[in-house]
């Protein structure tokens, strides 16, 4: 049986793990990193690059380098949070035909799942290189507070990348699996505080030994899918823009190249200030005016950073209160606080979380790797490699339908253990009504319009009758991935309509199929480019070796032989500048043949 991989598809960084001899192992990428930047770059020669190579060229190619795409996945263009992001990123965010938030790169319109699929493809290839076998199945993590649309969009991304997503698992739950599996302790309740690059989650989880099984039961979850390290970076960037404008009278916010440099510098400074009290941000030639080039040189202290972001950390504590209330437990019942996500390395985050829970936070798991490790454990459970583990997760938000008067009527309450199925009987609002519209909603507001619309469908051919007489049975079936199937049935006639809820936007099957084909085509382009680079490098190495031999004073060689070799070198140097692989290989072989004579005569 082929391996099932565990992937943490993060806003800022992604990570991949697999069970090896029953133990989770984080897999290093081709650059030697244990995490991969969630960055996708589109180059001038129409190549797609992912991870560190994409991040490295972001400064010189800001409009075609995409990052923090996870913040757009499953969202509408008109959402306030998307509109806020438009002002902060150098790339172009647009509205698709159905109103979803997409991006435009080099005159091509791309859906967030399509871009996320490029990151997943890199993860897939990394795993295949490590395992030396084809990988087709994965467990992918999402923020616990992701709604149905965002979960479905993540599954779509996996499909485009050529992966069968066997399970979507909540990030804090995955971290709990990573933390609690090997710890042979008494039953305990933990709080997983997960502050990542773009999202925040808090989950209250009970770990118990039940009849020889380690049971992980999520008691409650809450969060904010638009709060994370990217927001901390933005605060630093805005402060740098403000300071520079005061000193130089120039506003850098309209300069995409300068903004990309500021972003990189802000992220670097933020990381440094977790271990030092002060750092310098030094960006020469950040811009220019009529008097010449301008340089940015600003000192930033840890206390200054803390004053800039303290309210963001406070914002994360409100969901913690709600999660405790929903779980019906007090702070003193929490045995351990687990920190997950790179932003939790910040000392002020650790202090404020510790103060809130009135307990010292745990720092004995790697916050960047725990989620991927947990995903690999869940993959092991699904494949039967890991036994005696039971995971009971919950739905983060209430699911219901719109009923008469524009009210949201819940069917599945938030924090209900999944998978689950709930059925409720409704009726018609008018006499002789022959059809009803089932409008599915997700959220906590009483007014239907104030909740997230997941989609609508009609149940037709209802037997005419006075209002209130027909019995329409509505069933909500929520699977282990947190994805919803809705069925409506006229109990008298047996007429039934059933759909898997996809948001009123989302990707159609045809769009997904086209994106899969596009991804496969790009994979061939990437392979060809990789072969070209390898071929060029081999030729370059041959040229270097032969040139070195020609300079050897002790070399005995005829003038015409030297001329032939030098001509071959010139030809090969010219061919290396092109992209004809066969010609490069042929000339390289010719040069090697000619140089063999040198070796024999030496």
Swiss-Prot record:
Upregulation details from the record are: By stress conditions e.g. heat shock.
The answer to whether the entry has keyword Transferase is no
- CDD domains per the record? ASKHA_NBD_HSP70_DnaK-like
> What keywords tag this UniProt record?
ATP-binding, Chaperone, Nucleotide-binding, Phosphoprotein, Stress response
Q: Where are the coiled-coil regions?
A: none
Keyword Nucleotide-binding carried by entry: yes
Phosphothreonine PTM positions read: 199
Cross-referenced InterPro entries: ATPase_NBD, Chaperone_DnaK, Heat_shock_70_CS, HSP70_C_sf, HSP70_peptide-bd_sf, Hsp_70_fam
SUPFAM superfamilies in the record: Actin-like ATPase domain, Heat shock protein 70kD (HSP70), peptide-binding domain
Which Pfam families does the annotation name? HSP70
Write one Gene Ontology MF term: ATP-dependent protein folding chaperone
Q: Which Gene3D superfamilies match?
A: 1.20.1270.10, 3.30.420.40, Actin, Chain A, domain 4, Substrate Binding Domain Of DNAk, Chain A, domain 1
What's this chain's function?
Answer: Acts as a chaperone.
The record's annotation in NCBIfam families points to: PRK00290.1, prok_dnaK
The family line of this record is:
Belongs to the heat shock protein 70 family.
Q: Please identify the protein, giving its name as recorded.
A: Chaperone protein DnaK
Q: Which organism is it from?
A: Carsonella ruddii (strain PV)
